[in-house]
């Protein structure tokens, strides 16, 4: 922090559709680059772990599980970074699929923020795949140990 300000950075990694491992590697690389530049808050695009354009692949259990595995990997491989990091992924909760931002800090998954306003016009079909987080009551906490199974 300098003069009461912190540096924030927005990153747009190269992603491959449904290649969560490649995408996570790019995110991790960019986190370390942003750290070198002094960023303390790092924001990545929605669904950056899977890529936004997965379409019907969002309904594949393998994709959803791999996204969680790579989220844990990102948290673990950035544990030494002193920053608040936000990455996007699809997350199933109580039988519904949400487009969420995951907050990470010092190797921990702090929580998830589900997208509320889902566009459903022109080329955007988010409402076909995702549920709005508007009606979720309270905080949804999913411990990282769930992802180790």
Please give the residue ranges for each predicted region.
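Enzyme catalytic cores with a strong preference for nitrogen-chemistry domains
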Residues: 1-149
């Amino acid at each position: 922090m300098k003069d009461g300000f912190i540096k924030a950075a927005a990153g747009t990694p190269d992603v491959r559709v449904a290649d969560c491992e490649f995408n996570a590697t790019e995110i991790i690389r960019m986190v370390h680059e942003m750290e070198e530049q002094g960023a303390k808050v790092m924001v990545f695009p929605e669904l950056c772990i899977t890529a936004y354009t997965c379409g019907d692949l969002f309904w594949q259990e393998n994709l959803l599980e791999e996204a969680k595995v790579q989220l844990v990997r990102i948290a673990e491989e950035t544990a030494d970074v002193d920053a608040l990091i936000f990455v996007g992924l699809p997350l199933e909760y109580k039988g519904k699929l949400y487009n969420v931002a995951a907050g990470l800090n010092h190797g921990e998954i702090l929580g998830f923020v589900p997208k509320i306003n889902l566009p459903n016009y022109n080329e955007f079909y988010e409402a076909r795949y995702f549920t709005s987080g508007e009606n979720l009551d309270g905080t949804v906490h999913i411990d990282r140990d769930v992802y180790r199974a």
